[in-house]
Amino acid sequence: MNNYLILSDEVQRGMAQGLPIVALESTIISHGMPYPQNVAMAREVEQIIRDNGAVPATIAIIDGKIRIGLSDDELELFGSSKGIAKVSRRDLPQIIASKKLGATTVASTMICAHLAGIKFFVTGGLGGVHKGWETTLDISADLDELAQTSVTVICAGAKSILDLDATLEYLETKGVPVVGYKTKNLPAFFTRDSGLPLALSCEELTEIAEMIKVKWQLGLEGGVVVANPIPQEDELAPSYINGIIDTAVKEAEEKGIIGKDITPFLLGKIVEMTEGKSLEANIKLVKNNAKVGARLAVEFFK
């Protein structure tokens, strides 16, 4: 086991008992939602994973170590503290070396999960290709990580603040399977259907588990995206949310917000403009992903 990893007691017990472990990121807690809803969401999501037969492992960087599984106090710390670093692949060595607090993104959570031998990871939405990428080249490191790190990511598609068309094209170029679970089109985070058709879709988790096994047994390194739409009763009307997203993107451009600050800014702005409706939808879709992700992990290890 890597010297930089510390596994929580719950994760160690789960591994010893041969239970499936499901990773969770910490950026969603520190940068993706306001306090105290973020901490409540994190605890509820962990419980949903337990209730569906798997063991949750929220991942974060604390005091020069990669923590695989956080205590209640640590979840509270990540939810309520200001100035926690947002850590992607590029930032991991520096944040660990400097012993700072670091919240893991999709990319770095995949890396840490892989180091710990964890094959499944639940999140809200993927990062991807940002709108206006033709001039900024702003493409999330999440996509390249999926091309090289063998972890399955269960999400509600890519975040709808992104250029979803380009994101799907990029994943195709990198050979990353994007499987729609009970959907033939890519879900768009707050809404169930982006209108973009997927090459792969499955009605049953057993089919997805089998496909993932075959992929890795063939020596095809890299992740799999399981795109699981937000439940119908929780989705926001596309005509409503898409206009708000466009306004928020425009404001970010005007303010010159770029790089890793753009996603937290946009999500915060959208919560403000929807008077909290987007936050409620975000929490619901993460919980739904946790249920599906835990069940998929159980299926995989049968």
From Swiss-Prot:
The record, for SUPFAM superfamilies, names: Indigoidine synthase A-like (SSF110581)
Summarize where substrate binds, as residue positions.
Answer: 86, 106, 140-142
Name of the molecule in the record: Pseudouridine-5'-phosphate glycosidase
Q: List the cofactors.
A: Mn(2+)
What species does this protein belong to? Glaesserella parasuis serovar 5 (strain SH0165)
Q: Which UniProt keywords apply?
A: Glycosidase, Hydrolase, Lyase, Manganese, Metal-binding
Asked if Lipid biosynthesis is a keyword of the record, the answer is no
> Which Pfam families does its entry note?
Indigoidine_A
| Binding-site residues for Mn(2+), renumbered to this chain | 138
- Identify the domain of life: Bacteria
The chain's coiled-coil residues are none
Catalysed reactions, as listed in the record: D-ribose 5-phosphate + uracil = psi-UMP + H2O
Q: Which family does it belong to?
A: Belongs to the pseudouridine-5'-phosphate glycosidase family.
A Gene Ontology cellular component where this protein is annotated is: cytoplasm
Subunit info? Answer: Homotrimer.
Instruction: Provide the cofactor note recorded for this chain's UniProt entry.
Output: Binds 1 Mn(2+) ion per subunit.
